[in-house]
């Protein structure tokens, strides 16, 4: 569906050339939600703006739906852009136009007649959950409602691809989840390919099928989201995964609990996919003569399956504890000893 081959973007500056995207290679399948994550300055925004040619690549080739979009110009490029919708961090709405008029705007530009425009706008208002707000102006809307308008406008011309440029970064956590749920619903209903960039691992976890990690213009790691959570390869990827698995509050809680258990061992278990549903602790207590205390745990869902972690205290004879740990390994659960007496 989308193919990037050795794509490079270099900006000219007084201080010298700046390579924003450095030999990027990506393949994004039709109908998937693909995330690109990186910190500020990683090259994410430059990368996504190459997809619809808001930025031209310095070198390399970009193919979308069997069309080499990096090689076309003029009317052919304008037509291609109608098949690629885009939403932005700060909404980019026309403040002098109502919700209906904002959504209708790309249809006007495309030359769609008035009756068809009206029908399409009604469909989109219903799709994004803005019934009753069609005559409101952007200044009368909440941040989440503004982004819903942006999504509806981006879908006006029935695009095959939706680009999301930090679309939830300006929203509070609750509204972020609502917008992510909407994007997930649109993806399932319309079979739309969604490419989003973000610096928040929560966004990747919640809706993406696969993820690419960017650092200093390079794509340093790609893979299914669950695989990346299971086995991050790069240091930057490990830091992003730790945003969810090792929060500061969680670490402080674990440290305070460890002080209460000077004997035995404190271990962290990582459950991925089907392992989440295995009765690991039940089997552990059945086959081991040790005491098992649960100190802390959480389970979360990704588009590829569940993952979770459990911090437990094992107390008993050293030999029995070691046998218990070996038994956990046999259950194919990842284990880390984080403290021992």
UniProtKB/Swiss-Prot annotation:
Main location: membrane
Domain ABC transporter, chain residue ranges per copy: 2-241
CDD domains: ABC_MetN_methionine_transporter
Subcellular location: Cell membrane
Catalytic reaction(s) noted: L-methionine(out) + ATP + H2O = L-methionine(in) + ADP + phosphate + H(+); D-methionine(out) + ATP + H2O = D-methionine(in) + ADP + phosphate + H(+)
InterPro entries (UniProt xref): AAA+_ATPase (IPR003593), ABC_transporter-like_ATP-bd (IPR003439), ABC_transporter-like_CS (IPR017871), ACT-like_dom_sf (IPR045865), MetN_ABC (IPR041701), MetN_ABC_transporter-like (IPR050086), NIL_domain (IPR018449), P-loop_NTPase (IPR027417)
GO cellular component: plasma membrane
Molecular function GO labels: ABC-type D-methionine transporter activity; ATP binding; ATP hydrolysis activity
Transport found in the keyword field: yes
The keyword Translocase is assigned to this record: yes
E.C. code: 7.4.2.11
Binding residue positions for ATP: 38-45
Signal peptide positions (record): none
Cited Pfam families: ABC_tran, NIL
Annotated keywords: Amino-acid transport, ATP-binding, Cell membrane, Membrane, Nucleotide-binding, Translocase, Transport
Membrane disposition: Peripheral membrane protein
Task performed by this protein: Part of the ABC transporter complex MetNIQ involved in methionine import. Responsible for energy coupling to the transport system.
Subunit architecture: The complex is composed of two ATP-binding proteins (MetN), two transmembrane proteins (MetI) and a solute-binding protein (MetQ).
Family: Belongs to the ABC transporter superfamily. Methionine importer (TC 3.A.1.24) family.
Name this protein carries in UniProt: Methionine import ATP-binding protein MetN 3
Gene: metN3
């Amino acid at each position: 569906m989308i193919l990037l081959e050795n794509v490079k973007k270099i900006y000219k500056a007084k201080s010298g050339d700046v390579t924003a995207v450095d030999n990027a290679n990506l393949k994004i399948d039709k109908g998937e939600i693909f995330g690109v994550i990186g910190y500020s300055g990683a090259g994410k925004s430059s990368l996504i703006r190459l997809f619809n040619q808001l930025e031209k690549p310095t070198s390399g080739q970009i193919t979308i739906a069997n069309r080499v979009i990096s090689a076309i110009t003029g009317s052919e490029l304008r037509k291609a852009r109608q098949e690629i919708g885009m939403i932005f961090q700060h909404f980019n709405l026309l403040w002098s136009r109502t919700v209906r008029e904002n959504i209708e705007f790309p249809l006007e530009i495309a030359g769609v007649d008035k009756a068809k425009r009206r029908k399409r706008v009604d469909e989109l208002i219903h799709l994004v959950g803005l019934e009753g707000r069609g005559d409101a102006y952007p200044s009368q809307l909440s941040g989440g409602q503004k982004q819903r308008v942006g999504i509806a406008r981006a879908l006006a011309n029935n695009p095959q691809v939706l680009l999301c440029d930090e679309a939830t970064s300006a929203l509070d956590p609750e509204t972020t989840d609502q917008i992510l749920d909407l994007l997930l619903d649109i993806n399932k209903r319309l079979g739309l390919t969604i490419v989003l960039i973000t610096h928040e691992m929560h966004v990747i976890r919640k809706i993406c099928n696969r993820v690419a990690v960017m650092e200093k213009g390079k794509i340093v790691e790609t893979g299914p989201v669950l695989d990346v959570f299971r086995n991050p390869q790069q240091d930057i990827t490990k830091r992003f995964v730790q945003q969810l698995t090792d929060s500061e509050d969680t670490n402080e809680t674990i440290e305070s609990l460890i002080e209460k258990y000077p004997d035995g061992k404190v271990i962290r278990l990582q459950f991925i996919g089907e392992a989440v549903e295995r009765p690991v602790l039940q089997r552990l207590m059945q086959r081991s003569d040790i005491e098992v205390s649960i100190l802390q745990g959480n389970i979360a869902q990704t588009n590829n399956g569940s993952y979770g972690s459990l911090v437990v205290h094992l107390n008993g004879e050293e030999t029995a504890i070691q046998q218990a740990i070996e038994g956990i390994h046999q259950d194919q659960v990842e284990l880390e000893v984080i403290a021992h007496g």
